[in-house]
Swiss-Prot record:
The keyword Methyltransferase does not apply. Gene3D superfamilies: Zn(2)-C6 fungal-type DNA-binding domain. It holds the Pfam family Zn_clus. The keyword NAD does not apply. Residues 17-43 bind DNA. Residues 101-146 are annotated as: Disordered. Residues 101-113 have a biased composition (Low complexity). CDD domains: fungal_TF_MHR (cd12148), GAL4 (cd00067). This is C6 finger domain transcription factor nscR. The lineage of its organism: Eukaryota, Fungi, Dikarya, Ascomycota, Pezizomycotina. Keywords: DNA-binding, Metal-binding, Nucleus, Transcription, Transcription regulation, Zinc.
Amino acid sequence: MEKRNQKKRQQNAHLSCELCRERKVKCDKLDPCTNCASAGVVCVPVRRPRLPRGAHARRLRRISPEDPEASIRIDISPGAGTAADEDLKKRIRRLEALVDSMRSSASQSSNQDQESRDAIESISNETEDASAPTPDSSRMPLGDGGLRVLGLSGPSNLEIGWASIIEDKETTTQLCQVYLLNVDPVIKILHRPSVERWMLQGERYLGFPERHAAVESLGSAICYVAATSLTETQSWARFHATKSSIVARARRACEAALEKSSPLVSPEVTTLQAFVLYLVARRSEDPSRAVWTLMAFAVRIAKALDLPGGADETFFGQQMRKRLWLTICLLDFQTSLSQPSEPLISVVEATASFSPPRHINDSDFSLTTSHDIPDREGLTDTTFSMVSYHVQVAGRLLNFEPSVGDYETRQQHVQQFEQRTLRLLFYCDPESTPYAWFTWHRIQCFVSGARLSAVRPLRHPRGGSTSCMIPLTGTNESAGPLSLALNVLEKVQLVHTDPRGEGFRWFVTVPWRALAIAISECYVCQDRALMQRAWPIVEAAFQQHEAAVSGSSKAISTTLERMMCRIREKLSLTLGTSAITASPTFGITSIATTLSVPHTPPSQSSITSSGDLLSNWPWPATELSHPGPDLALVAGVAPISSSLPKLDPLLHSLDNQLVIAAQEPLVDADQSWAWEEVMASLHHDETIGADMFLS
């Protein structure tokens, strides 16, 4: 009983007196204290129970029904309580005002920092054991449109001068030139002549007033995505700095400009264009799931602006809206492939709203164009983007549409895709420009990818069911999924090794699905010669993929690494130890000397005979007989009866390739289990972890 009474008496602690608190000196807590006695003043002691600290205070607030904003009652000596309480409230209000002001601005001046530190220190000494009250969250400024919640503004302590990259006209001009060379040909959402007149010649952009928030955000987004498209060599040549430093500065400037323009509530299409360019650049720079998450906002904003069905009065506005909506659909499809999820835009909505823009050059129309312009033949500024738009529609149907289950239906979708896209290559000379060369080879890669989707669809198993994969077997081993996957990987490496692909390397990564198919097919392949050709390509692609997603993508990396270990064990017995030990050292720089794809520019006369053509796939021709060795596909195909216009001699025998093999699927468990294991493993990783993988 005595111990309990003693403990109860000790709860009323003798704290520092009022004068020692004001002077911020150590109090010996005597009555009177030594400091007050030596100063000759009246000592006002403070006695009250100690308040809970840390976790105890938080737990008490959770279970307490009292108002959290209620004032703290302090029992002090008579005559001094009112003054102390008023002084404490005054300091708390000053601290709250400083916190609100700090949250409303990105950077703080040195005097504000010192004042806030003094206020915090003063409050800490004044309340000693009390927990500091938190400001009401409803009073937080919301003028940034909510983008701070999305983490776009980055850390609050940005260094001074971070926006100088946008204010520097010379740097902005060079980044705009990089954008027009590297980004605009593949991400076609802006009008090239208008951008040139605005950023290179100093004119106003599309009638917007000077320093409009939407225009400034678009300019900063152009600089950011241009910086991410640079190679290290280009960065040193143009800016005498590393690419990482240029990208970091441009990203901070872009995020600050986006906060100012408030894309979540802005009615301007220009602001959404800036946000989409930010997502493109962020996806190229950051392999995490951030862009996958932010895509939901882009889709919602686009629907709020009525991009899919909105009818603009001018031809210019119609083209810009169609380009922007289809680019958002493309990004939605790409991010869905890079994460274990289905696209946000459904297959029905994507196909119903698919209205491609005109296949024309940007110089063919302007803001004042009042009449319709017909499509052009040959390569235009929008050719690659038009193909990309068709890719996302075909990819959704082949991979995410449950009704497209049988092999014949997928054949029809692939055939329609090839008919629409290969027509865009009419009169395209891959030797004319780097853009033409890149478009030529990427379309071949897209066609191979579509054919892979027909035989190896990306369909996550649900409820224990297996995916609707169609295994292919036959006497011609070079005509199966392995050769299709190898062609995709070779085309990716070609872009990363040929000088003509330097400006577009930022846009091309190793697709994880083609790599996974190649690994799984290599594991069950019985053709020794094909394996000797395929293994260096697969090993190099695996190393490049691992380097690109290092530290951020665990699900697919774990699955691929596990399968690579198994296939290395198998090949060490079949191909010999020398072949396996040499593969891990197969660097990216030596790919050009190992791949079977030609790396020298083909001559005009050799293109139609034995070059790197879609027409070189060994399918039986209906009208022409110019098959070549580049891309092999399934033998015994049915000819297509389509009346396509006659092609330029450059694509002499391309019209007979607009068909996918119409053979009966042959089921072979030995050649189908590997891909099923990949999908099952990815599905398992999806359910047990939050790590995502890069496409």
